[in-house]
Amino acid sequence: MWLGVITLFPEMFRAVTDFGVTGRAVKNGLLELHTWNPRDFTHDRHSTVDDRPYGGGPGMLMMVQPLRDAIHAAKAAAGEEAKVIYLSPQGRKLDQQGVTELAESSRLILVCGRYEGIDERIIQTEVDEEWSVGDYVLSGGELPAMTLIDAVSRLVPGVLGKQASAEQDSFSDGLLDCPHYTRPESLDGLDVPAVLLSGNHEQIRLWRLQQSLGRTFLRRPELFENLALTDEQSTLLAQFVEAMDKNA
């Protein structure tokens, strides 16, 4: 997957290229990341990249000319098939379904705003989609962009090594993940569930699915609104709720 990022702080993206899953993906040639800094497209000696908003008010906006030129440079490098994404609180909220959709694109250009944002005409003429990572305020689009990159890259074939790792992540099937355990078998009086030590793969699968359903029921019940449970899932969830009521 090819990724271009428009940012005033390209150094921040070393967290993507140098570390963890995404760092290995870059090293192995599965992920290619390039940055364009609007400061490199300025024409004054101060490398000015902000400007005052029409109508007054607090704060500044990113200057149009350097930002637009940076986007054009990224588009020229990416090719016509690239999709331009602006990280914005006004965008569609990123969830696993959205991540899956974005992962179908082989080339993405991510525009990271700063200050109070960017000129609306840039969004109208240069941006294909707006995405948000949540209903809260951040200082810029870099952290949302890194969040999007990390989530999308996990779905690129070969990045995780085993596709099962991605398939078992929280939200991959619309549910929260089940609990996980490692050694020792007993920790401060808390034991690993016996079923996980049984070696019975079918029973382990059912336990994990039931725990995933139960955890979603307890913590994020609204997720069920978008799910059509199978007969097996419905039965397991009913059993979980019944057992919970008995132990209440």
Curated annotation (Swiss-Prot):
Source species, domain of life: Bacteria
GO cellular component: cytosol
Entry EC no(s): 2.1.1.228
UniProtKB keywords: Cytoplasm, Methyltransferase, S-adenosyl-L-methionine, Transferase, tRNA processing
Top EC group: transferase
Protein family per UniProt: Belongs to the RNA methyltransferase TrmD family.
Name of the protein in question: tRNA (guanine-N(1)-)-methyltransferase
Chain's gene name: trmD
